Amino acid sequence: MAELRMEHIYKFYDQKEPAVDDFNLHIADKEFIVFVGPSGCGKSTTLRMVAGLEEISKGDFYIEGKRVNDVAPKDRDIAMVFQNYALYPHMTVYDNIAFGLKLRKMPKPEIKKRVEEAAKILGLEEYLHRKPKALSGGQRQRVALGRAIVRDAKVFLMDEPLSNLDAKLRVQMRAEIIKLHQRLQTTTIYVTHDQTEALTMATRIVVMKDGKIQQIGTPKDVYEFPENVFVGGFIGSPAMNFFKGKLTDGLIKIGSAALTVPEGKMKVLREKGYIGKEVIFGIRPEDIHDELIVVESYKNSSIKAKINVAELLGSEIMIYSQIDNQDFIARIDARLDIQSGDELTVAFDMNKGHFFDSETEVRIR
C-alpha cells in the first residue's frame, strides 16, 4: 500500500511543448485512480514516469514521502500490467506468473504459495499448466494480472489492459479488476482512453488533454460538473450537448428558441457579467425529456423538435435533432413508437444544464 505525490511534473522530448505539462496529483493509499483522455494526451507517458521507465524532465515524484525520481524501476516496488499481456509463449501459466519471483530468487515454497493464491483469486487454478496459446484473451489478461499480484507490490500500474479484448470480455474484466482492487486494496493507477472504464472503475478520475490535467474528481463529480467543454464532451456516451446562445436576463436564446434559465443560475451569470453576451450552454442527453408531465412542468424550456434519426437501443431511444442547425441528442424512454421524420415536443431540464464561457470554454460558476 502506498501514498503517491506528483508535484509540478514535466516531460520534454525534442519538441518545445511539453508532453506532460505541470502535472500535480496526490493519490491516497488504496485509491484506484484512472487517467483518461484521447490518444497523445500524455496519460501513458505519465504512467511510465511513475514506473521509472521514462525520466522526469522536471518536478518531483514521491512514494510514501520518499522522492524517487532517481530510483531504478526495480526498486520502486511497483507492478505493471500492459496492454499486450507480455506473456512468454513457451512458459506455462504457472511459470509466467512465477517468473518475476524466480528472478528475485525467492524460495520455491513461497513462490508456490503466492502463485496458487493468485490463481485462486483470478480463477486460474485449472489453467496453471497450460501455455498462453491455449487461453482466451480474458484468461491471458488474468495471467498478466496474476504476475502483478504475486509481486505484492505497493502500487499497481495498468496501461490500457483491456483494449485488446472484445466488448463483452471488457465488461467482464472491468468487474474482475474492481473486485480485485476491493480485495487487495492496493494503490492503483489505471490508464485508458475509454471513458466508460473511467466512470465505472475509478475512485477518482484524472481527465487529460494535450499533456495537461483538465479535471480531477470522483466519477459523479466529473460527469455532473464538468470543468470545461472538453470534459463535458469527452466524458459520457453520448457526450454532453452544446449550444451557442445569447443570454438575456432570465433567458438564453439559441437561434429562434428561448429557454428560461433558473434564477439560481441566472444570479451567477448576472454577477459574472454575462448578460447580453454569447455563452455555451451544455446539457446531458438524459436531461432532455419527452414525458408529458415534464413538458408541462417545463413549458418555458420546451421546444418542438423534428427527429432526424431515431436509434432504438432496447429500453431507450436516442433522438437526433437540431435547434437552428445546432445538433443535439436526447436519450428518452422507448415506450413510444418514434420514427425518423416525426415531430416531438421535448423539455430541457435547465436545473441540470451548465453554462461555459464562449472564449475560455470553462464552466461559469
From Swiss-Prot:
Induction: Expressed in the presence of either arabinose or arabinotriose. Repressed by glucose. ATP binds at residues 37-44. Keywords: ATP-binding, Cell membrane, Hydrolase, Membrane, Nucleotide-binding, Polysaccharide transport, Sugar transport, Translocase, Transport. Pfam families: ABC_tran (PF00005), OB_MalK (PF17912), TOBE (PF03459). GO terms for cellular component: ATP-binding cassette (ABC) transporter complex, substrate-binding subunit-containing. This is Oligosaccharides import ATP-binding protein MsmX. GO terms for biological process: polysaccharide transport. It is a peripheral membrane protein. Belongs to the ABC transporter superfamily. It is found in: Cell membrane. The keyword Transport applies. NCBIfam families: PRK11650.1. Residues 4-235 form the ABC transporter domain.
